[in-house]
């Protein structure tokens, strides 16, 4: 018996967002300038005018958010002596997944005497979302680096708490090929993760800030002086590494803590303008 066209038809595959963005910065005549730029798919990079010696790059995901099966790859190289600030146009939204992870991979190379600020705005995890994110940084001789990753579990204004969101966030930082710092953050949608006193303790927002440079101990003293007694945060410095971890009940409270910390620790000494919009 001949099958009808309707019986033969199989479900069309869901469209997925894929993108790649690459940028290379070079020091020329005392200022950091664009050397190379490549963008493909949903990844776009914009270079707003800056008035300091650093170059600012804004990463844009034109798909408007990520869900299961989406993939984005970013790569940035700061050549010798250059200063590069990388941020995002807005908060990245991770929507409910049907089973697959959304994947975001970032690779940064910081040349001799160069500095990179990796300052993306917050990532918002929606209920049922799944995100697998990785950050690899290769530092060469005398290179310095500052990074922040902030996560919001749902949107406070909408009464969301994203209790079943899944996150795996992997950081690997190398100095001249040797591993100097590693982070492995995981959320598996378990109740104890949200309420455990040694974990989130009921908070809906958290952030990690990392600064690598020769003045880590000095900056730790300055950082502790700007963290109020009511802030749920811990900071430490070992060798050239300074790490700050913060939890907060809301995204607004989190920003109030991390914005002055980022301004203190960043190579540019200030936040990208998009953080103020």
Curated annotation (Swiss-Prot):
GO cellular component, one term: cytoplasm
TM helices/strands, residue ranges: none
Keywords, comma-separated and alphabetical: Chaperone, Cytoplasm, Nickel insertion
Broad class of the protein's primary localization: cytoplasm
Molecular function as annotated in GO: nickel cation binding
Region (Disordered): 1-20
Compartment annotation: Cytoplasm
InterPro entries: UreD (IPR002669)
UniProt function note: Required for maturation of urease via the functional incorporation of the urease nickel metallocenter.
Record family assignment: Belongs to the UreD family.
Self-association state and partner proteins as the record states: UreD, UreF and UreG form a complex that acts as a GTP-hydrolysis-dependent molecular chaperone, activating the urease apoprotein by helping to assemble the nickel containing metallocenter of UreC. The UreE protein probably delivers the nickel.
Record's protein name: Urease accessory protein UreD
Gene: ureD
